[in-house]
Swiss-Prot record:
Entry's free-text remark on domains: The FFAT motif is involved in the interaction with MOSPD2, VAPA and VAPB and its phosphorylation regulates these interactions.
The entry's keywords: Membrane, Mitochondrion, Mitochondrion outer membrane, Phosphoprotein, Transmembrane, Transmembrane helix
Gene name in the database record: MIGA2
Residue ranges of the TM segments: 11-31, 42-62
Species: Homo sapiens (Human)
Compartments it resides in: Mitochondrion outer membrane
UniProt keyword Ribonucleoprotein present: no
Chain ranges for the short sequence motif FFAT as given in the UniProt record: 292-298
Protein name: Mitoguardin 2
Amino acid sequence: MAFRRAEGTSMIQALAMTVAEIPVFLYTTFGQSAFSQLRLTPGLRKVLFATALGTVALALAAHQLKRRRRRKKQVGPEMGGEQLGTVPLPILLARKVPSVKKGYSSRRVQSPSSKSNDTLSGISSIEPSKHSGSSHSVASMMAVNSSSPTAACSGLWDARGMEESLTTSDGNAESLYMQGMELFEEALQKWEQALSVGQRGDSGSTPMPRDGLRNPETASEPLSEPESQRKEFAEKLESLLHRAYHLQEEFGSTFPADSMLLDLERTLMLPLTEGSLRLRADDEDSLTSEDSFFSATELFESLQTGDYPIPLSRPAAAYEEALQLVKEGRVPCRTLRTELLGCYSDQDFLAKLHCVRQAFEGLLEDKSNQLFFGKVGRQMVTGLMTKAEKSPKGFLESYEEMLSYALRPETWATTRLELEGRGVVCMSFFDIVLDFILMDAFEDLENPPASVLAVLRNRWLSDSFKETALATACWSVLKAKRRLLMVPDGFISHFYSVSEHVSPVLAFGFLGPKPQLAEVCAFFKHQIVQYLRDMFDLDNVRYTSLPALADDILQLSRRRSEILLGYLGVPAASSAGVNGALPRENGPLGELQ
């Protein structure tokens, strides 16, 4: 090989020297007189230089092609002796080595029977991890790319050495231990899935008793060879899982499945159930049962708060009666606000909602309470519009007209029909004012149309233009909705008249570019939501009886209105003699802000 390289370089040098001597030969042959008479233009010089350079390039290319042809002729006889079906040993080793799942950075516990996120888990197993330095993948790539077995074997050992150096420099022993435990957990999950799939196949392929009665000859036949192999594999897998569980208990697992339910029960102060006591027992007795292979996801799904009594810090007779009505399906609701109001479950929310409805019904039978809630609503919106530097005159006129219409008994039947068409299932103060008007308005402001956001986020438009455009959009929407009303002069029509003054202010406050107005609107929303959360909290109000709950809601309303109106700079609606303190047996309200 060295002789060939020397021969090739000598030929290249001879060719280059020959081309370089051409100008010298021409000069010595024709003499200086001929070249002195010949004048070369710059263009002709470029042509001559390009011609010489191209000639050299063609010569080099031809020489290189000759060398490749010689190599193919020499390699052909050597490869002819090998069999086509054989594969080099390093490639087989690299393929036979089981590759560990690399996506261990995202830890999750999955049930073998659950079908959710199977596609995602497959993608994550294909995708290389950030910290992946697996010697198997590196070795397989080097073995396939290498042309000789010795080079592949050396690449395998080099890859292992590279992995060891990378892992030792990547983190300390503790982090490596955690990574190993995570990979061990993932291996356990895969083994559990394999066992569950095998058990499903066995259950699907087992003959029925009536089939054995019909065909006694076939029933008495021994198991076929594939079935016996499957059974033997399942037994080996069970023993492997049994050893793996004991190994996990010995060294401690990152996600103990048995203690998770017990810790959750201690947190919620729930009594120990039969399932939790069974999980406390040794796994040897229940190794072949499906309970051994429950994942943490199934444990959380099986633990539903509605199946257990909710922990009560004090007696709540009214709440317990309402909870019984909820279980019977006698408490309707338009929209579930379980998460927003911090309830344990939907049943908990519906039971408290039933009590709150009845409490407001008893409160509003008193004329003074009607005046109080009407005055508080008027003052809150007036203070909000004053903070936004808007005149509240038009709002006050529309608000008084809506109140006078709503307080007339002859309009209640029409109002009920209108609100039932909007999904309101109960004619209570909570369902109409707090839920249908306020909470729906906050939800609409959280998801504004894209066209409105495009105008408000345009840097080239002034704030006044944005405010005018937003107000025009609100008015046009309300005008279009007014045309579709079932009752042209009903409660919804009066509500739209109020919204024409309030909606642009709220929309520009929540979505506009003014930070001071946005802070005021955010505080307004926070107080309303916190007022409802306190109302649905067993520790802040008494659910012992409906009169006690009504009294606590009234005191809570006075306290919250004082906080909000004081922030807006408006005198409080409550008199000086009422300070909003709750009775002693109810406990302190604490800081409500």
